[in-house]
Structures are given as structure tokens and as C-alpha cells.
């Protein structure tokens, strides 16, 4: 998506878009240390599970590129990397992408130290740094590829829900059978099918990833493939990622869209499901447990219950890095609580009497009594019984008739290693399998 990037990176330099200033200002912060990355993540200037992991990984890569570790031996270099990664983990404990990236990068660094043939300590340290930097940059590169695949699989999954298996299913261009013109009955003699409308929550697009997005990536793909009628997005209180960021991305891409408050979803489904063919709620995930329970932005659980009540598909879009096979269920997921002021106060650009938005003047105002007690969890956990499918870069995993999700089908090696406790096969050991399915040669691991 040209012109809209949350992360700008070149070896030795990292810039992160300050998303708290959107949609009115484009300001990139230079991030040259792990402390600056930690602050960007904690303050939510950067957010979204994939983007958080990428920024954390690349911030340390920038430090290492400039040799800020000051290591004298390869062992010191590994110790420095591990210490800095442990520090970064505390910036957003709920996001499994961050913990997965940290585990990978620790393995990479240790393996680089063991594999180096350098004859002096300085060169050995350089090999460890290079091993880390290469792996961190690969995380950035792979994320975009992953998101494009999620978008494609998700769009095709939803298309199949609209178009029964039949002659046109095998047509080279199924989009020509989709229309927004009612009345239009599936399977009608003219072989036309309703374009679908969807609802999304929070922000899961280019601003939350390296590009394209996960849940919003599916919406982008639906639009590009001519299957989409309309996209609805929630404001996503209390941080308003939907109104500030998702609405901004949808308008930027000229995708037909409407913003609603979080509490309007039930009314939207009741009044407009049939007329707009609202077919799915699509959300992202900060962590998916082994049984399919999903931690995501607060308000996701409510939407899932409403979707089930209205017989609307509830779809989770997430890379396999967000699937945590070591966490058995949502009961084991740590939920982050945030500051009470996020509910009781709000900031924004000042609107003049003429309706003009003055981006150079911001104000913070109180919207609740400052003495009220506040409970402000950043995430909730949606039980797997409310989720119809999890869309990943390897395809969809659909809830079975028994109410279970079989992630083993898309991650057999990880399942064997982390769930069954089996050793990877000799063939798999030739290439080490990282959490997102990307394979690195063993010498780089």
C-alpha cells in the first residue's frame, strides 16, 4: 500500500509512524534504541501484534548495527541480545507474536555464536550481530508475504460461503457472478450472487503490520476481487483504533465503508443483515490458544456473541505466529490492564467553529467524573465456541462439528514438537521451522 507504512526500515535506521497523531498528522519517530521501541509500544504509538514484534526486533537490530552492545566476546554478544530481548518482552505481554519473535531471535543468536569460524573475538561478535540482524529483517520481509496470503485465503473462504459448489465455482473469474443489486437469490437461474458486507473491529491493516494487514487485509482482498459490497468498522473504545486508524485506511483505499460505535453492532445486524448481506465479522488476534480461544482487542467477545445470535460468520484472521500451542486455553492468557484515564479522558485535534480541523492545536478533555473507579482491560478472550474459522497464511482452520480447531493440519511439526513432545523428523531438521512457517537453513539458525 504505497504511501501508508507503519514501519520504515533500512539497515541501521528505523522509523515508526506515531499512530496517536493519526488521522490528522503523519509523524515518524526515529527509533534507535530498545528503550525508544519499548516506549513506542507501551504508549501505543505503534500497535498491532505483528508490528509490535517487528519494531522490537528491528530496534535491537539497529543497536547491534551500530555496535552499541560493546561486546568483547561472542558470549557477551549473546548475553546482551538476550537481556535486551527480555526487556522488550515487557512492553506488551499479551501479544504472542512478540514472544515468538524473541524466542526465535534468541535461538538464532546462540546458533550464530556456535557456528562462527572467526579466528578473533571481534569477528566472532560481528558474526553474532549479523546473524541477529538478518533474522530480524527476515521477520519484516515474511510478514507482508504472510498478510497477502491471509487476505487471499480469507476472501476465498468467504466467497465459498456465498457461492455454492457448482459450475461457476470452477470459473476462472468468479467475481463476475457477484452483484449488489437485489433481489438476488443464491442459485438463481441468472447465476448471480450477492456481494457481501462485513464488520471489523480495532485496526488490523497496514498500520498494524508491515503491510496489507490481517483482518483488514481480507477486506482489502474482498474489495480487490470484487466480492465486497460494504465494510463496517467499530470505533473500538477506549483507544479508538477503529475510528482513528481503520476508518482512515478504508477511506484512503476508497473502500465503501461506514463507522459505527461499538454498541451499535447488534442494531446493525438486526436492521441491515439482509439488505446489506452482512455475512461475517472479521477480527485479528493477539493470541490464539491451542483450543481456539482468542485474545483480541476488548469488545471482540461481545461481537462474537452478537454474530452467533444473528447467524453471521465470526472469523479470526491471524498468522500462525499468533497461534500459541503451548497455551492450552484462553484461561491461561495474561490480559493487560491499562490506565483509567484512557476511559475518562480523550485527546484530539481542535475543531473550529467553522468545522475546520486544526491539526496544530490539540486538546485533552475529561469525558467522565475523574473520581470514578475504572476497569480498563486492553483485551478480552473470545471462547472458541463462538469462532467459525481461523484464517492463516497456510489456509483456514474451521471449527469442527465437535467444536474443536485442529491446528495440527497446518502446523504438524510445531504440533509434534510443542504438543506431542516429539522430536522433529530428520527431514525437518534439515531446515529449522520457525513459528510463522518460514524455513531458514540450519546454518542461519
Swiss-Prot record:
InterPro entries per UniProt: IF-2B-related, IF-M1Pi, IF_2B-like_C, Initiation_fac_2B_a/b/d, M1Pi_N, NagB/RpiA_transferase-like
EC number: 5.3.1.23
Keyword set, alphabetical order: Amino-acid biosynthesis, Cytoplasm, Isomerase, Methionine biosynthesis, Nucleus
Broadest EC class assigned to this enzyme: isomerase
Pathway assigned to this chain's UniProt record: Amino-acid biosynthesis; L-methionine biosynthesis via salvage pathway; L-methionine from S-methyl-5-thio-alpha-D-ribose 1-phosphate: step 1/6
Biological process, per Gene Ontology: L-methionine salvage from methylthioadenosine
Signal peptide: none
Catalytic residues of the enzyme: 286 (proton donor)
The reaction(s) this protein catalyses: 5-(methylsulfanyl)-alpha-D-ribose 1-phosphate = 5-(methylsulfanyl)-D-ribulose 1-phosphate
Function: Catalyzes the interconversion of methylthioribose-1-phosphate (MTR-1-P) into methylthioribulose-1-phosphate (MTRu-1-P).
The name this protein goes by in its record: Methylthioribose-1-phosphate isomerase
